[in-house]
């Protein structure tokens, strides 16, 4: 944690990615945004975070450090989507090892919260298709269930986290790009390659940081208008 604290003094952007047991309630294709939010909060409130990736970087894309934090809270009897758990296993996540060697969610977020408060920096959070990422982050920092409506959720995010940018939303607003592009495809548009393994939080968020800086370079006005709204909550989480 001391290394993260040192980086916070020089880097105010944090790209995040999470790995979790996926959605616990299916959302219909034509559900309203509020219904999608209710399904997301149902899953996030009942499931436990497995892994969190953090990449601290600056506006020019210089990376201060990348961390992949494994949490020990997720156990064999906890709520899960079995297909998603098998997917994570196939992509190299050793859930037993994470359970044995990981750290507690509450302890990490408590320390991280006070670290951010101590540095007094205006942190900008960056995600890719990140409604669930932000929901788990908010839950971790507050230690509470998610707000009962999407409007209250957005207000809580603004109050607790401040500026949040979703790279997928940004891509949809940039000429020549599209919100339909996945992270890997978007990275290739800028000649960037992934470091590490896909579907691991650390690798995902480091790639998000690199692409964000590339997108921001020709479109610096994005930062003048404050944080973008979170992407409309999808019916199915991408883990």
Curated annotation (Swiss-Prot):
Cofactor(s) annotated in UniProt: a divalent metal cation
Protein name stated in the entry: Putative CCR4-associated factor 1 homolog 8
Listed GO CC annotations: CCR4-NOT complex; cytoplasm; nucleus
This protein's encoding gene: CAF1-8
Chain's role: Ubiquitous transcription factor required for a diverse set of processes. It is a component of the CCR4 complex involved in the control of gene expression.
Enzyme Commission code: 3.1.13.4
Keyword flag Metal-binding: yes
Domain of life: Eukaryota
């Amino acid at each position: 944690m001391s290394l993260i604290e040192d980086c916070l003094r020089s880097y105010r952007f944090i790209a995040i990615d999470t790995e979790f047991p996926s959605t616990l309630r299916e959302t219909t294709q034509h559900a309203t945004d509020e219904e999608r939010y209710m399904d997301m909060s149902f899953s996030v409130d009942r499931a436990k975070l497995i892994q969190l990736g953090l990449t601290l970087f600056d506006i020019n894309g210089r990376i201060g450090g990348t961390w992949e934090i494994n949490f020990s809270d997720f156990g064999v009897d906890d709520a899960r989507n079995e297909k998603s758990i098998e997917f994570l296993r196939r992509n190299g996540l050793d859930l037993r090892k994470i359970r044995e060697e990981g750290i507690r969610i509450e302890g990490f977020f408590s320390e991280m919260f006070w670290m951010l408060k101590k540095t007094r920096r205006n942190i900008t959070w960056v995600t890719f298709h990140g409604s669930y990422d932000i929901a788990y982050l908010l839950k971790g920092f507050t230690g509470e269930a998610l707000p009962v409506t999407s409007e209250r959720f957005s207000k809580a995010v603004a109050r607790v986290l401040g500026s949040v940018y979703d790279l997928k939303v940004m891509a949809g607003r940039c000429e020549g790009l599209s919100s339909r592009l996945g992270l890997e495809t978007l990275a290739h548009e800028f000649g960037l390659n992934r470091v590490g393994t896909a579907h691991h939080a650390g690798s995902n968020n480091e790639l998000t940081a690199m692409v964000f800086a590339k997108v921001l370079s020709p479109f610096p006005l994005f930062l003048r208008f404050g944080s973008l709204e979170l992407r409309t909550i999808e019916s199915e989480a991408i883990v």
